[in-house]
Amino acid sequence: MSILLKDLVGGIENKLYMSAMKFNAIANGGLANLVNLSNEQIVDAVVSQYKITLEEIEETEKALVDNDEVEIYDGYCDVFYTFKYFQSLLVYCYGKRDKETVDEVDSLIDAVDLGNRYVALLLKTVELDLSILDEYADRVIENNMQKFTTSLEEFKTWESDYIPTSKEYDGKL
Protein backbone atom coordinates (compact mmCIF):
# COMPACT_ATOMS: atom_id res chain seq x y z
CA MET A 1 0.00 0.00 0.00
CA SER A 2 1.51 3.31 -1.04
CA ILE A 3 2.03 6.08 1.49
CA LEU A 4 -0.53 8.29 -0.26
CA LEU A 5 -3.15 5.53 -0.28
CA LYS A 6 -2.36 4.74 3.36
CA ASP A 7 -2.86 8.40 4.28
CA LEU A 8 -6.13 8.65 2.35
CA VAL A 9 -7.53 5.44 3.84
CA GLY A 10 -6.21 6.46 7.26
CA GLY A 11 -8.04 9.78 6.99
CA ILE A 12 -11.33 8.05 6.23
CA GLU A 13 -10.68 5.49 8.95
CA ASN A 14 -9.90 8.24 11.47
CA LYS A 15 -13.01 10.23 10.53
CA LEU A 16 -15.15 7.15 11.23
CA TYR A 17 -13.28 6.42 14.48
CA MET A 18 -13.81 9.98 15.74
CA SER A 19 -17.50 9.65 14.91
CA ALA A 20 -17.64 6.34 16.81
CA MET A 21 -15.99 8.07 19.78
CA LYS A 22 -18.60 10.83 19.69
CA PHE A 23 -21.46 8.35 19.26
CA ASN A 24 -20.31 6.26 22.21
CA ALA A 25 -19.70 9.33 24.37
CA ILE A 26 -23.33 10.30 23.81
CA ALA A 27 -24.74 6.78 24.11
CA ASN A 28 -22.82 5.48 27.13
CA GLY A 29 -20.21 7.97 28.25
CA GLY A 30 -17.58 6.57 25.88
CA LEU A 31 -14.00 5.88 26.89
CA ALA A 32 -14.11 8.54 29.63
CA ASN A 33 -16.76 6.49 31.43
CA LEU A 34 -14.70 3.29 31.52
CA VAL A 35 -13.14 4.19 34.87
CA ASN A 36 -16.64 4.02 36.38
CA LEU A 37 -17.29 0.48 35.17
CA SER A 38 -16.70 -2.69 37.13
CA ASN A 39 -14.35 -5.32 35.74
CA GLU A 40 -17.39 -7.38 34.71
CA GLN A 41 -18.86 -4.41 32.85
CA ILE A 42 -15.52 -3.83 31.08
CA VAL A 43 -15.44 -7.47 29.99
CA ASP A 44 -19.01 -7.14 28.70
CA ALA A 45 -18.17 -3.92 26.82
CA VAL A 46 -15.07 -5.39 25.15
CA VAL A 47 -16.78 -8.67 24.23
CA SER A 48 -19.85 -6.85 22.91
CA GLN A 49 -17.76 -4.53 20.74
CA TYR A 50 -15.70 -7.52 19.57
CA LYS A 51 -18.86 -9.32 18.43
CA ILE A 52 -20.14 -6.23 16.63
CA THR A 53 -16.78 -5.75 14.90
CA LEU A 54 -16.47 -9.43 13.97
CA GLU A 55 -19.94 -9.35 12.42
CA GLU A 56 -19.02 -6.27 10.36
CA ILE A 57 -15.77 -7.89 9.19
CA GLU A 58 -17.60 -11.09 8.21
CA GLU A 59 -20.23 -9.11 6.29
CA THR A 60 -17.52 -7.17 4.45
CA GLU A 61 -15.59 -10.33 3.61
CA LYS A 62 -18.81 -11.84 2.23
CA ALA A 63 -19.53 -8.70 0.20
CA LEU A 64 -16.05 -8.95 -1.34
CA VAL A 65 -16.63 -12.60 -2.28
CA ASP A 66 -20.07 -11.75 -3.69
CA ASN A 67 -18.66 -8.65 -5.42
CA ASP A 68 -21.54 -6.62 -3.95
CA GLU A 69 -20.25 -3.08 -4.46
CA VAL A 70 -22.76 -1.34 -2.21
CA GLU A 71 -22.14 -3.74 0.67
CA ILE A 72 -18.38 -3.56 0.14
CA TYR A 73 -18.27 0.20 0.66
CA ASP A 74 -20.83 0.13 3.45
CA GLY A 75 -18.97 -2.75 5.06
CA TYR A 76 -15.61 -1.01 5.02
CA CYS A 77 -17.15 2.01 6.71
CA ASP A 78 -18.81 -0.16 9.35
CA VAL A 79 -15.55 -2.04 9.95
CA PHE A 80 -13.57 1.19 10.30
CA TYR A 81 -16.27 2.56 12.61
CA THR A 82 -16.34 -0.46 14.91
CA PHE A 83 -12.77 -1.82 14.87
CA LYS A 84 -10.93 1.23 16.17
CA TYR A 85 -13.41 1.66 19.00
CA PHE A 86 -12.99 -2.04 19.86
CA GLN A 87 -9.23 -1.51 19.80
CA SER A 88 -9.55 1.45 22.19
CA LEU A 89 -11.64 -0.61 24.62
CA LEU A 90 -9.13 -3.45 24.46
CA VAL A 91 -6.14 -1.15 25.05
CA TYR A 92 -7.91 0.37 28.05
CA CYS A 93 -8.70 -3.07 29.45
CA TYR A 94 -5.15 -4.34 28.98
CA GLY A 95 -3.59 -1.21 30.41
CA LYS A 96 -5.90 -0.36 33.29
CA ARG A 97 -7.44 -3.57 34.57
CA ASP A 98 -6.14 -6.50 36.60
CA LYS A 99 -4.72 -9.70 35.12
CA GLU A 100 -7.87 -11.69 35.93
CA THR A 101 -10.02 -9.29 33.90
CA VAL A 102 -7.57 -9.34 30.99
CA ASP A 103 -7.43 -13.15 31.10
CA GLU A 104 -11.23 -13.33 31.04
CA VAL A 105 -11.38 -11.03 28.01
CA ASP A 106 -8.69 -13.09 26.27
CA SER A 107 -10.64 -16.30 26.91
CA LEU A 108 -13.76 -14.84 25.27
CA ILE A 109 -12.34 -13.18 22.16
CA ASP A 110 -9.69 -13.76 19.51
CA ALA A 111 -8.23 -10.28 19.13
CA VAL A 112 -5.27 -11.51 17.05
CA ASP A 113 -7.53 -13.13 14.44
CA LEU A 114 -9.75 -10.05 14.36
CA GLY A 115 -6.71 -7.81 13.89
CA ASN A 116 -5.35 -10.01 11.11
CA ARG A 117 -8.67 -9.97 9.29
CA TYR A 118 -8.82 -6.19 9.69
CA VAL A 119 -5.35 -5.80 8.18
CA ALA A 120 -6.30 -8.12 5.31
CA LEU A 121 -9.27 -5.86 4.57
CA LEU A 122 -7.05 -2.78 4.78
CA LEU A 123 -4.72 -4.26 2.18
CA LYS A 124 -7.66 -4.70 -0.19
CA THR A 125 -8.52 -0.99 -0.09
CA VAL A 126 -6.25 -0.58 -3.13
CA GLU A 127 -9.18 -1.99 -5.11
CA LEU A 128 -11.61 0.69 -3.87
CA ASP A 129 -12.48 4.10 -5.23
CA LEU A 130 -11.57 6.19 -2.19
CA SER A 131 -13.82 9.08 -3.18
CA ILE A 132 -16.77 6.68 -3.05
CA LEU A 133 -15.52 5.25 0.26
CA ASP A 134 -15.25 8.77 1.66
CA GLU A 135 -18.80 9.54 0.54
CA TYR A 136 -20.06 6.35 2.17
CA ALA A 137 -18.20 7.30 5.35
CA ASP A 138 -20.03 10.62 5.46
CA ARG A 139 -23.34 8.79 5.02
CA VAL A 140 -22.56 6.29 7.78
CA ILE A 141 -21.60 9.11 10.14
CA GLU A 142 -24.71 11.12 9.30
CA ASN A 143 -26.94 8.07 9.73
CA ASN A 144 -25.45 7.17 13.10
CA MET A 145 -25.61 10.71 14.42
CA GLN A 146 -29.28 11.01 13.43
CA LYS A 147 -29.97 8.66 16.31
CA PHE A 148 -29.35 11.60 18.67
CA THR A 149 -30.41 15.21 18.73
CA THR A 150 -27.76 17.85 19.29
CA SER A 151 -30.33 20.44 20.30
CA LEU A 152 -31.14 20.75 23.99
CA GLU A 153 -34.37 22.56 23.14
CA GLU A 154 -35.44 19.76 20.82
CA PHE A 155 -34.58 17.16 23.46
CA LYS A 156 -36.67 18.96 26.09
CA THR A 157 -39.74 18.93 23.82
CA TRP A 158 -39.35 15.39 22.52
CA GLU A 159 -42.35 13.15 23.00
CA SER A 160 -42.51 9.47 22.24
CA ASP A 161 -44.60 8.31 19.31
CA TYR A 162 -45.11 5.02 21.13
CA ILE A 163 -48.77 4.15 21.57
CA PRO A 164 -49.41 1.34 24.03
CA THR A 165 -51.74 -1.30 22.67
CA SER A 166 -52.66 -2.51 26.14
CA LYS A 167 -52.54 -1.31 29.72
CA GLU A 168 -51.60 -4.80 30.82
CA TYR A 169 -48.06 -5.48 31.96
CA ASP A 170 -46.66 -8.50 33.71
CA GLY A 171 -50.15 -9.99 33.74
CA LYS A 172 -51.64 -7.00 35.63
CA LEU A 173 -53.93 -4.19 34.55
Where on the chain are the PLM-derived regions?
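Flexible "arm" and connector segments at domain edges
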Residues: M1-L173
